[in-house]
Amino acid sequence: MGLDLARATRPLPELALAYFPNARSVDSDRDPGAGAVQCGDVAEVCSVTNDPDHGHIPVLLDRCVELLAPALTRTDPDGTEAVLVDATLGAGGHSERFLTDFPALRLIGLDRDPNALAIAGDRLAPFGDRVTLVRTRYDGITSALAEAGVRRIDGVLFDLGVSSMQLDQKQRGFSYSADAPLDMRMDPDALLTAAEIVNTYDAKTLTRILRDYGEERFAGRIADKIVRRRAKQPFTTTSELVELLYEAIPAPARRTGGHPAKRTFQALRIAVNAELDSLRAAIPAALAALRPGGRIVVMAYQSLEDRIVKQAFSTVTASRTPPGLPMELPGHEPEFVAVTRGAERADEQEIERNPRSAPVRLRALEKVGGRGS
């Protein structure tokens, strides 16, 4: 029987952790607001719309299932079933499909956004104690598994970047197409906001953020204008920043490469949420948690993320035999093999159905050796 989370009287993770008797809900030391989703939030958030995807159509859903399926069909002699970590739970679209297609699967869903956890918790309630939801960034995967009493996992999925659901919540400040507070926090309990960065960081630091995280070629020019503008009046809304960006970026450049605010907003969002630092820590942690035969699928939407994923995958698929030796040394074979040929792209049919999939780069590996059996 499905659980009615909107009427439940206990926090969602306590209910969801029934499958893992040693697990409990605790505040993560990585995120100040980490912990349980309060079920009262579910009714408030889920009453907004009847759309289960909340505007976020799962990207490359069939391909993700196809790639992870070989790792999720095992049954151990001790009776334990396969475990999948959805490291970017969002509205729960990918997770729902996996739980439906693999009836014995146990799922651990991670997200730092309590609104996302509330929405996904309501959506996944029919799967009962097969589901564990944890409020944490994806680099908290090791702690989340420890709290759930899970040593090794069979699959892990990352769908990186900001979700359509978050973009559509205009008050969050992620979108440059609507006026809203200059916020951009994926975790609303986090302290750092885009407004604080724009209003307090010096020109040199702002330039570095815009250049390194947004690949903005006018980073220095924009940073200088920000510093001069805020001396008269601090920035408080997205529209104020967008107006400055139109002034800072030369007209010929504004006519190419998409919206002139796109790169600056990306850079600020990445800085506010420490997205790249989190990803650099999360990928090795996820790889270490996989048992032999386990698989990882990562979908990235911009070059900075994909570069990190590509480098991490390249490292673990390389031989550990010292160069120059004529043969592979026993025990020095690669721990992982690629199950995609480089990065896969969405085809025209997928992009037509879901335009958000246009920039996606999907990479996948399988663990073939090493520790973790």
Curated annotation (Swiss-Prot):
Its main location: cytoplasm. The keyword Membrane does not apply. GO terms for molecular function: rRNA (cytosine-N4-)-methyltransferase activity. It catalyses: cytidine(1402) in 16S rRNA + S-adenosyl-L-methionine = N(4)-methylcytidine(1402) in 16S rRNA + S-adenosyl-L-homocysteine + H(+). GO terms for cellular component: cytoplasm. InterPro entries: RsmH (IPR002903), SAM-dep_MeTrfase_MraW_recog (IPR023397), SAM-dependent_MTases_sf (IPR029063). It comes from the Bacteria. Residues 343-373 are annotated as: Disordered. Residues 343-355, 363-373 have a biased composition (Basic and acidic residues). Its EC number is 2.1.1.199. PANTHER family: 12S RRNA N4-METHYLCYTIDINE METHYLTRANSFERASE (PTHR11265:SF0), S-ADENOSYL-METHYLTRANSFERASE MRAW (PTHR11265). Belongs to the methyltransferase superfamily. RsmH family. Specifically methylates the N4 position of cytidine in position 1402 (C1402) of 16S rRNA. This is Ribosomal RNA small subunit methyltransferase H. It comes from Mycolicibacterium smegmatis (strain ATCC 700084 / mc(2)155) (Mycobacterium smegmatis).
